[in-house]
């Protein structure tokens, strides 16, 4: 069990980073092994890690250095080695994490790879070049994920509702 926080379409990076730090404290119990963060002009990602696969090198958020995409995941991709064999291009793998494959699947297939995954997961992927973000979770919804919006159009995503409920006008379980 890990914990993730994602804030998208933000206006004030420094202010929202500070708010995200408050949010992530509420889910710190989900990941005692590592706290990681990423912030940019339009996005903040936070991750609380419970180490299961690649204990030494799987710290998140994960980065695709070629495309500059960033990924925060709560979950486990059981068939990560199998789906990695479907990749046609060479990629600069940084870890042995089962989740890193999501960056490269997105690179090659866009969002059309979810049906190929066997696992339990919820993730936020951000592309700073296009300012696009991709949020998904496993088909059954085993891994919890919540999404909400504030009056300024900021999108909030979190592993636990309690971390974002004070910020959102509308809040729901991620479909």
Which residues does each predicted region cover?
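Cysteine-centered catalytic environments shared across enzyme families
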Residues: 1-175
């Amino acid at each position: 069990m890990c914990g993730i926080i994602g804030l998208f379409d933000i206006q004030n990076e420094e202010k929202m980073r500070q708010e995200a730090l408050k949010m992530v404290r509420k889910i710190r119990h989900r990941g005692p092994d590592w706290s990681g963060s990423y912030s940019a002009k339009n996005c903040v990602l936070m991750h609380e890690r419970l180490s299961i696969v690649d204990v030494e090198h799987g710290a998140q958020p994960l980065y695709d250095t070629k495309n500059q995409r960033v990924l925060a995941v709560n979950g486990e991709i059981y068939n990560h080695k199998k789906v990695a064999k479907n990749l046609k291009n060479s990629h600069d793998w940084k870890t042995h994490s089962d989740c890193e494959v999501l960056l490269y699947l997105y690179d090659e297939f866009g969002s059309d790879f979810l049906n190929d995954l066997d696992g339990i997961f919820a993730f936020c992927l951000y592309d700073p070049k296009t300012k696009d973000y991709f949020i998904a979770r496993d088909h059954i919804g085993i891994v919890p994920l919540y999404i909400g919006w504030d009056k300024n159009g900021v999108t909030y995503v979190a592993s636990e509702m309690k971390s974002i409920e004070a910020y959102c006008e509308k809040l729901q379980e991620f479909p």
